[in-house]
Amino acid sequence: MTWQSPISPGYSWYEATIPERPVFPIMPGSRKADVAIIGGGYTGLQAACNLARSGTDVTLIDACRFGDGASGRNGGQFGTGQRVWADETEEVLGREWAQRLFDMAENAKRYVLGFAEEHAIDIEFMPGQLSVGHKASLERDYRNHVEAMTGRYGYPHLSFMDREETVSRLGSSHYHFGIRDTGTGHIHPMKLVVGLARQAALAGANLYEGTKALKIEKKGGAVVIETTSGTITADRALIACNGYIGNLEPVTASHVMPIRSFIGATTVLHGHPEILPGGESVDDSRFVVRYFRKSKDGRLLFGGREAYTADNPRDISAHIRRQICEIYPDLADVEITHAWGGSVGITMPRQPFCREVMPGVTTIGGYSGHGVMLANYCGKLYAELALGKSTELDLLKQLKIPAFPGGTRFRSALLFLALSWYALRDRF
């Protein structure tokens, strides 16, 4: 049977379609390291890989298996830029900041694709993305975005799609218009996790699964991490837990909020050549976004139905099927072979959160749905910062990310009320 993550619900199609998932041991006792990393997703594994290649003694631990969180269970879409469009960011932070954040995200895109190519990791990259509008009133915003990106931001890969083109490229009349992006694409996220873990191990990183961090503190000149298998004493540490931070570190927990998102995978869509004939991924304009794409073998992978509490739907497939049928009524009876969920780490402004939470301890997360690119790149940037090679990560440290209101006790309830209001607005 497909592996069931103990921290994320459902059985993932990604898990079922990787040829072999390496197993790493539980940490065999207390140890010392130059750098300790908590979290075996994209950020942590990239940091470990890059540090180990430079001769750093690095120890990485994960409470479960690598990729059990968002890195191995997400929608697989790269996107372009940050989670918030660059022209919208410009209105808040100004032109220079918007450009720098956009350039960082584009660097991230190139880095991930280059890393996979360099190390012959078959991530099943498929080009293209369609961002589609569910309200006719949003057309001017979409047109303005294309003009801004192809103009002052110098990104030539966007084009506006009218209703006829949108219907043709989606195989559905559900949306009014859209934007086609030929400069991005989508991947099999778990294959990237597996390939990355193997590269980190080959580089000499000490990788441990099934080893949970219980406490992190500064003692004298060292960072001390208490775990279920002993203590790690390190010169510095990276917290790369994102939406799975729990109560480990309060600053991260107050700024990065986990929300649940769910995905279903259908059987291969024989007899439906009209659905996404170009193979692009799709995201829509709803606040509670729907995102979907075809796999290389022709399945529809459909994501949506966010949840803002720890509760999960009893039948993930039923929730996903209802949303599929709104867009593709002819798929009412299609078999959903796998359905799963996981936690996405978001911040209030939907920008990444990077902060030194105590001397020598950095936390990175809150990618807000753009982690396939950004999490990998931020792991690399952390390694470069630790090695004194680059300060590009400081760009994110300077962002003023506010804490969520209500503290850890009431923030879920407050966010549920606020986002339920936005979800209601999606319908009108």
From Swiss-Prot:
It is an enzyme of class 1 (oxidoreductase). Gene3D superfamilies: D-Amino Acid Oxidase, subunit A, domain 2, FAD/NAD(P)-binding domain. It comes from Rhizobium meliloti (strain 1021). One of its GO terms (molecular function) is oxidoreductase activity. One of its GO terms (cellular component) is cytoplasm. Pfam families: DAO. The keyword Mitochondrion does not apply. This is Probable oxidoreductase OrdL. Its EC number is 1.-.-.-. Keywords: NAD, Oxidoreductase.
